[in-house]
Regions:
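Short, solvent-exposed loop/turn elements at beta->coil junctions and helix N-caps
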Residues: 27-32, 253-254
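Active-site acidic catalytic loop and adjacent metal/ATP-binding pocket
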Residues: 31-47, 51-52, 170-220, 232
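A general structural signal marking secondary-structure boundaries and capping sites
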Residues: 19, 75, 114-125, 176, ...
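Short glycine- and hydrophobic/aromatic-rich loop-to-beta-strand nucleating segment
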Residues: 88-92, 190, 227
Length: 344
């Protein structure tokens, strides 16, 4: 049996309470769902597959399970069959027949899905240090200060580029004000295509571990960075999300959150997940749109260090390009003027 020994009794209890059996007919570990002390299995009971999630960490999964259950009840996530906070185990329906998700369809389906998600009753909040979305960088205090200092000390980026990253972070954090009206139920892990499954009819959001009440633009920007490749794409994407053409303020806030996300994934993958491996900056970075296309289709997986470094670099290069555009300065101006009157 592949279940960790310390979790076997809890899994047996889960199967018994949910299905009236003490063992699954089949069980197979899912590699791309297993990470960060979480193990995910496809289990078959009486001919029907389900997803068994076993959390090996010690933190309380109440927020995770609460958000996942709310999304499932709304038809945005697979049906939840069982959760146990103390045992840190969940069983949900297994999304069968997932197929490649064409970008053209995603431009319409994903923002509609996010609009439905954000229409749900408010999700629980989460302590700032447990925020694993890009809005972590918009916080203030010793945790973010320590991370920025660590990034500077590790010197993964060339010195002048590290100064640029810190300056752009400070600029964005000073302008992008938190607003109560912009907080909404959020998935917070949509930079990965594996968390948006398309079965040919419906789109399902899976892996709710990072979910909480967050800035609505965080999910919107993270997903867009994979699938929006032109101004025309952006018009479609934002139009579907807002239900009409976005105004200048909405476009500005969206664009700035995209830049926050670029900084976040630069830091996460070049600095925190590179394993200390030296980066050869003489080698050109991959093309951003090509990399994201291959990432979206599953051709690229962020499992090995070289892929993680390449991912961080394409985000960094895209940020450097975007901050030189007139739109960046205009977006800063629009949000700065609005922020004067709307801060918490």
């Amino acid at each position: 049996m592949m279940i960790p020994e310390e979790k076997r009794a809890a899994v047996t209890k889960a199967l018994s309470e949910t299905f009236g059996v003490t063992a699954a007919d089949e069980i197979r570990q899912i590699s791309n769902g297993t990470f960060n002390k979480v193990q995910v299995f496809r289990v078959v009971v009486r001919g029907t597959p389900y997803l068994l999630r076993v959390i090996l960490r010690t933190e309380d999964p109440t927020c995770h399970f609460t958000c996942m259950s709310a999304a499932a009840e709304a038809g945005l996530a697979p049906r939840v069959r069982y959760t146990n906070v103390e045992d840190r185990i969940s069983i949900t329906d297994f999304v069968q027949g997932a197929i490649p998700f064409p970008r053209a369809e995603a431009l319409v389906r994903v923002p509609r899905l996010l609009r439905s998600l954000q229409a749900l009753p408010a999700f629980p909040g989460r302590a700032g240090h447990l925020n694993t979305s890009c809005t972590f960088l918009l916080q203030k205090g010793p945790v973010i200060d320590g991370l920025l200092q660590r990034c500077k000390t590790m010197a993964v980026l060339p010195h002048d580029q590290m100064d640029e990253l810190l300056a752009r972070h400070a600029q964005l954090a000073s302008v992008y004000a938190p607003q109560a009206a912009e907080m909404a139920p959020s998935h917070n892990d949509l930079f990965k295509p594996d968390n948006m499954l398309f079965d040919g009819q419906r789109t399902w959001l899976v892996d709710w571990e990072a979910a909480f009440q967050n800035d609505r633009y965080a999910d919107l920007a993270a997903a867009a960075n994979m699938i929006v490749t032109s101004d025309a794409d952006e018009d479609i994407y934002l139009g579907e999300f807002f239900g009409q053409a976005p105004d200048a303020y909405q476009r500005a806030r969206f664009f700035l959150m995209q830049q926050v996300a670029h900084i976040f994934y630069t830091m996460a993958f070049l600095i925190l997940q590179s394993g200390g491996q030296r980066i050869d900056w003489r080698e050109p970075a991959a093309d951003y749109d090509d990399f994201q296309q291959r990432f979206w289709t599953g051709e690229i997986k962020l499992e090995e260090t070289p892929a993680k470094i390449a991912y961080g670099r394409v985000h960094w290069e895209r940020l450097l390009r975007n901050v030189q555009s007139p739109r960046y300065e205009e977006s800063l101006r629009i949000c700065a003027n609005t922020a004067r009157y709307t801060r918490f």
